[in-house]
């Protein structure tokens, strides 16, 4: 694969290989491998010539069909550096030579990246050839957080078309959203539906970072984007998305840095092209997990639950770059795996502080067959205030939550004594709560191939007015089943008539 191009000072020659790196021929700094410990490699350089922290080192030899790139993480002595491998170290041996590139890992940015799939080093991995156009440049994956004076706060709602989110935990344009959930409760399906609903209607650019997740899901997403027209294979520059993958089969170094590579591409569209960018990450937990693996190999003493002592700093360094400025915005949607469904685990807990909206997926709701399995009581948003959503939306959402909370508190009594022991008022609340619970379900476009039910995009006006009618008791006469997997209240009425005809 042809190498990408980039500018450096001095007379430079290009090293052949996948990584986009240049070295100054007259001052080439070569080190030798002295120790290999899976994803961590120690390199010895001439005394006093150790590379700077975060510099990229490139192998002279070819391993597994490409050159191996390392990133300097620690200075062990005045001649030895400890590095993180960004690809497999299979075949590496002592005394192999590595060249100091004199710069951090850099990736291509610009319109030439649209419609393409990249790895952590910015190499195209979609079998569509190298980047050949001139409308891209090279940028290091590390950059400063925008100045406070340049940052901008918006109070505009981003409509997702998903009822439970738009009503109870709305997303802000230019905000950060977390999708929390354990294994198998629907985080990736929800993020794919959000990409389908928002990216398709969104006129700006979407950047997706696949951090340590399944390769199959990455492949599915790529083809989903092609089918929906977000990626145009014939005319790449008409595409609206960039995909950057560091999947779970890759070493921890790649999984740790791939989010920064994708974020660098997103920042270009925000800062240079003044666009509103959607930045999707699946999964932030894998970012933390890879940092924990690297930390242990680097010999750091772990902190709580075995995580790296630098967890908060690493998370903050990335999250603070995801912000809106006077030039453009980055709206971020991040899937966050919750180990053992424990939200107090340090990995998801560290993410909470950075988010504007949290969408929590519940296994108990998934067990009821209600999808998306969003917990309406655990999910929250800073946008749910009268000033932002308006009085009608705010009052309806609070009444929905009150009914669901009352139902939750009555469940123990119902389990022990049964419904008969409840007052008439409580029986009415339970009946409405069960209807609301089912009405929060919704068929997804991306799940249509599995369910056979066409997906729906529900407008915010439909969502608010439908729930207003339910909490006011206008549809108390309809059966619970009529509210399941429908878009709005009119569909629920039609479904009730159909059920009545069928004798259900």
Curated annotation (Swiss-Prot):
Keyword Cell membrane tagged? yes
Q: Which reaction does it catalyse?
A: ATP + H2O + 4 H(+)(in) = ADP + phosphate + 5 H(+)(out)
Against InterPro entries, the record matches this protein to: AAA+_ATPase (IPR003593), ATP-synt_VA_C (IPR055190), ATP_synth_F1_bsu (IPR005722), ATPase_a/bsu_AS (IPR020003), ATPase_alpha/beta_chains (IPR050053), ATPase_F1/V1/A1_a/bsu_N (IPR004100), ATPase_F1/V1/A1_a/bsu_N_sf (IPR036121), ATPase_F1/V1/A1_a/bsu_nucl-bd (IPR000194)
Chief location of this protein?
A: membrane
Annotated membrane topology: Peripheral membrane protein
User: Which positions bind ATP?
Assistant: 181-188
For this UniProt entry, the molecular function terms from Gene Ontology, in alphabetical order, are:
ATP binding; ATP hydrolysis activity; proton-transporting ATP synthase activity, rotational mechanism
* A cellular component annotation (GO) from this entry: proton-transporting ATP synthase complex
Q: Signal sequence span per UniProt?
A: none
Q: What does this protein do?
A: Produces ATP from ADP in the presence of a proton gradient across the membrane. The catalytic sites are hosted primarily by the beta subunits.
Family note: Belongs to the ATPase alpha/beta chains family.
Q: What is this protein called?
A: ATP synthase subunit beta
What is the species listed in this Swiss-Prot or TrEMBL entry? Ehrlichia ruminantium (strain Gardel)
């Amino acid at each position: 694969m042809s190498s990408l191009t980039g500018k450096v000072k001095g007379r430079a020659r290009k090293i052949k290989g996948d990584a986009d790196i240049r070295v100054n021929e007259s001052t080439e700094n070569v080190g030798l491998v002295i120790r290999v410990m899976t994803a961590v490699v120690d390199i010895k350089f001439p005394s006093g010539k150790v590379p700077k922290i975060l510099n990229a080192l490139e192998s002279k030899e070819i391993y597994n069909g490409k050159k191996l790139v390392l990133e300097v993480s620690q200075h062990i002595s005045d001649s030895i550096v400890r590095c993180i491998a960004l690809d497999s170290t299979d075949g590496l041996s002592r005394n192999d030579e590595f060249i100091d590139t004199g710069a951090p890992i850099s990736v291509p940015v610009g319109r030439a990246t649209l419609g393409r799939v990249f790895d952590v080093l910015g190499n195209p991995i979609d079998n569509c050839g190298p980047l050949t156009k001139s409308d891209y440049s090279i940028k290091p994956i590390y950059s400063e957080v925008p100045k406070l004076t340049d940052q901008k706060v918006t109070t505009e709602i981003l409509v997702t078309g998903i009822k439970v989110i738009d009503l109870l935990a709305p997303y802000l344009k230019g905000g950060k959203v977390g999708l929390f959930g354990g294994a198998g409760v629907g985080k990736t399906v929800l993020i794919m539906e959000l990409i389908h609903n928002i990216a398709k209607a969104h006129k700006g650019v979407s950047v997706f970072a696949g951090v340590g997740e399944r390769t199959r899901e990455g492949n599915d997403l790529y083809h989903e984007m092609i089918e929906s027209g977000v990626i145009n294979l014939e005319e790449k520059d008409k595409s609206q998305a960039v995909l950057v993958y560091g999947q779970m089969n890759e070493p921890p170094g790649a999984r740790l840095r791939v989010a920064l590579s994708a974020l660098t591409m997103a920042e270009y569209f925000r800062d240079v092209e003044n666009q509103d960018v959607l930045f999707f990450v699946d999964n932030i937990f894998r970012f933390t997990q890879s940092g924990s693996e690297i930390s242990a190999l680097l010999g750091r003493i772990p902190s709580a639950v075995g995580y790296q002592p630098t967890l908060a700093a690493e998370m903050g360094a990335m999250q603070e770059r995801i912000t809106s400025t006077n030039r453009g915005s980055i709206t971020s949607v991040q899937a966050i795996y919750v180990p053992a469904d424990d939200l107090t685990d340090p990995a998801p807990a560290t993410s909470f502080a950075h988010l504007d909206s949290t969408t929590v997926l519940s296994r108990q709701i998934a067990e009821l067959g209600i999808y998306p399995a969003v917990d309406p009581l655990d999910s929250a948003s800073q946008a749910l205030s009268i000033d932002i959503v308006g009085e009608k939306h705010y009052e309806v959402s609070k009444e929905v939550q009150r009914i669901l909370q009352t139902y939750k508190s009555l469940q123990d009594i119902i389990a022990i004594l049964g419904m008969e022991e409840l007052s008439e008022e409580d029986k009415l609340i339970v009946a409405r709560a069960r209807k609301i619970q089912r009405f929060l379900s919704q068929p997804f476009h991306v799940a249509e191939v599995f369910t056979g039910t066409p997906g729906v995009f529900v407008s915010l006006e439909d969502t608010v007015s439908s729930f207003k009618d339910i909490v006011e008791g206008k549809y108390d006469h309809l059966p619970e089943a009529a509210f399941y997997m429908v878009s709005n209240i009119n569909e629920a009425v039609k479904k009730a008539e159909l059920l009545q005809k069928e004798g259900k």
